[in-house]
Amino acid sequence: MLRECDYSQALLEQVNQAISDKTPLVIQGSNSKAFLGRPVTGQTLDVRCHRGIVNYDPTELVITARAGTPLVAIEAALESAGQMLPCEPPHYGEEATWGGMIWRGRVARGAVRSAILSSARASLPALENICVLVAK
């Protein structure tokens, strides 16, 4: 069972502190796609604690979840309503996260970024609630 946790305030404080200290941040979930792209350095901002499905209305074909929500939890919720994501994200481990799927992207066709409706906080898109269209 997924334990939902809203760590928005704590994450925002960490980001503001990093800005104040001029410290680079590496936003990280399960780190399952760390091998993609070039290595980055900075203080790790772990978003795995910031998890849970915030809103899901199958009739509206929209799901909103926090960045650290495991991708398998999202897919299970959608499957229970006979729905699926509008893409086929790679699973590089059972702990792959919702935020990682969106912000690390997909190298081929079917990028979920094309289906993003909104992000609750434009200045911190990987940390806040991410709203995505789903397919029937």
Residue ranges and their predicted role:
Residues 1-25, 48-94, 104-135:
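N-terminal glycine-rich flavin-associated loop
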Residues 34-39:
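Short glycine-biased active-site loop of nucleotidyltransferases that positions the nucleotide triphosphate
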